[in-house]
């Protein structure tokens, strides 16, 4: 593709620079050129002292595209749609839900939302404030808005794509016009997303005038993060080396927690505290063999996966999820096999969810035996997806390494030991110096304060302590003078104090100002981190009044909700507020990025 250059007098480039630019981009597609525009815009605005232009009010033809992402999938879909729209010469403003000024929603004419769901039907962390606002009485009428929603979820959870459903339903209730029916996509979302993106482009091309995308539409919020500019992605991971696999719980602990160190070599892979490490794993060969034998299948039977033909056993080991059952798998297996044991569950969503949650796929087959063809088995299963682990290190200290904290999942089903797919792969089946495929999942919604003087409160029981190890390494390297406070909990002090020596050193050296520990099984009555929060409520409120940033990491379904309830009680009690005002205060902290959560 070539473009006619303007007269040299009008250019800020020398003739030699212009020639190099034209040579470098002569074969770029319109989509690639649009992406490059956003890339350069991002570079300009990350230069020291660079001023970001104040964006003028969006004209009626600008499409607002909101990305509400938890693990990065929704963001990738939104970025791909942005590129499609720019290639179609449509103006689009891509913005993360956490950066969106939601009170301007009444002025939107064209609104596209790509939303994932976390936990039990909750919106992603960056979209909590927007979700709460839209579902509240404060939400305005949207009679002049047209919208479309793409939802991402996981059918292994009961409230599949609930956040997307909430946005779609509420926007319609507020009077907005639905451009397209909502799409709810499972973990294998790519094909559905591609088809939906094309439909969105077609509808919008017919609706708005075509014009060259203006610079204002490619805003800093939609620009490329330079840290993220890497050839290694979820689809094209880095082959790294596992260098350390160390059990960090005691001999008598009920938990098996591993400290894992991975050598990134000279790949140049960069991350920040708060990011996650994606790990591609293989299923246990013994589990694969057990499943094959139960179904009377041969491991060497050739099957087709995508464009590849490979043995069935290899396909099961590398390409399909075997350790997480879902209601859909149970229902489809029951229908396919006409199993007398499972057919009574069909049509009862609650019973299907309960059965799937407590019965792994291999045990479902054992309890309801059948004989399947290889293609029938693969048709039941979901594609294998990588697991994400909160990074427990800072490159300011460990350089070309990345550390994670892995709680190994182990349980018994009628005397048979079962284990989590990725956690047992890392703990049991990878020897030191073995290769492991990894990538960085950046998380801009879990970041240290920009100013090193800001106090930090960290709440992370169990393996939720991982990112706070990274935070402290970074704060130490930066010489940050802000106070640091850690709340940590686990069953037993003697067996389960993860990274104990490191925390004690930070306390001794004064970097860790306070540490409050909750050992749930070391006394007759159970004590959890939320109890410590209530106990230290007055001091916690003082820190918040001083501008402290508050972070929570760990279990989404119970711990994070219990911690949030304790925080609300503290805010109400020591801030002199009623429950509604305390909730509003915490929401404001979230909007200001002073209350951030990494929950799963």
Swiss-Prot record:
Q: Which reaction does it catalyse?
A: hydrogen sulfide + 3 NADP(+) + 3 H2O = sulfite + 3 NADPH + 4 H(+)
* Molecular function GO terms recorded: flavin adenine dinucleotide binding; FMN binding; sulfite reductase (NADPH) activity
Give the protein name, as stated in the record: Sulfite reductase [NADPH] flavoprotein alpha-component
Task: Tell me which domain of life the UniProt entry assigns to the organism this sequence originates from.
Answer: Bacteria
User: Has keyword Isomerase?
Assistant: no
Q: Which family does it belong to?
A: Belongs to the NADPH-dependent sulphite reductase flavoprotein subunit CysJ family. In the N-terminal section; belongs to the flavodoxin family.
Its needed co-factors are: FAD; FMN
Q: Which organism is it from?
A: Cronobacter sakazakii (strain ATCC BAA-894)
Where does the chain bind FMN? Answer: 69-74, 116-119, 152-161
